[in-house]
Every structure is written in structure tokens, then in C-alpha cells.
Amino acid sequence: MVMTDPIADMLTRIRNANIARHETVEIPASNMKRAIAMIMLKEGFIKSVEEIDDGKGGILKLTLKYGPNKERVISGLKRISKPGLRVYARHDELPRVLGGLGIAIISTSKGIMTDKEARKAGVGGEVICYIW
């Protein structure tokens, strides 16, 4: 079956595993999903990213992060730019998620980066999702 929005599927898998307090979640791999996972790792939302070769496109195995009493580190994930309605923002219009407590992931001409990095680089782009 062809997936119409693989990024939304990735975010939904992470959200569901997080709510169920699973240790890991497996996601079909792609370059964009890999870049999003690496940003989540760098920003401290997940513990680790592992690539598994399944003979097809590969699988990303994300280890989710929880606090000392099993409280969730990821409070929420929201897809912003969808296949039916793309959302773009200039560098001076990039959104701040929860006043800077969360991150927006932006697809720019210089690659996929957080809203803070895009503001610093002075580039705008497609607002992929919010994570807080």
C-alpha cells in the first residue's frame, strides 16, 4: 500500500509509542525521516537512532526517552505542512513553538533544520512539524 504522508505516519508512530510508554519504535526509513530523527536526537527528545537493513528501504529504530518516573519527554508532535496544504515561512516569519520551549522542524534549501538554526542561517522554508 502506498502511503500518502510518510512524515505524518512517522510522527503518529512516535506519538502512539510514547503514549503507550514503549521503549522503542520502528519506522520505515527515508532520508527525510532520518534527518528528522537526527534533529530529535540532537535536541534531546529521543535517546538513540539505529538503522536496520531489512533488504528493502531500511528501518529506523528510535529509542524513546523518559524521565526518572517514566514521564514523557515528548509532550506533543504536530504535523504542520501536509501534502494537501503546504506551509512555508520566511526566515523572519518562522514560528516559535511554546515560546521557545519546543522546536519547529523546517525543510530549507540548506537541508532540514530546527527553527532556531534556520533563523540563525537566515533561511526560510517548509514548516514540517512542531515538537514540544
Curated annotation (Swiss-Prot):
Transcription among keywords: no
Protein name: Small ribosomal subunit protein uS8
Example of a GO cellular component annotation carried by this entry: ribosome
Single biological process term from Gene Ontology: translation
Subunit structure comment from the entry: Part of the 30S ribosomal subunit. Contacts proteins S5 and S12.
Organism: Thermoanaerobacter pseudethanolicus (strain ATCC 33223 / 39E) (Clostridium thermohydrosulfuricum)
NCBIfam families found in the cross-reference section: PRK00136.1
Protein's UniProt keywords contain DNA-binding: no
Functional description taken from the UniProt entry: One of the primary rRNA binding proteins, it binds directly to 16S rRNA central domain where it helps coordinate assembly of the platform of the 30S subunit.
GO molecular-function terms, A-Z: rRNA binding; structural constituent of ribosome
Keywords: Ribonucleoprotein, Ribosomal protein, RNA-binding, rRNA-binding
Signal peptide: none
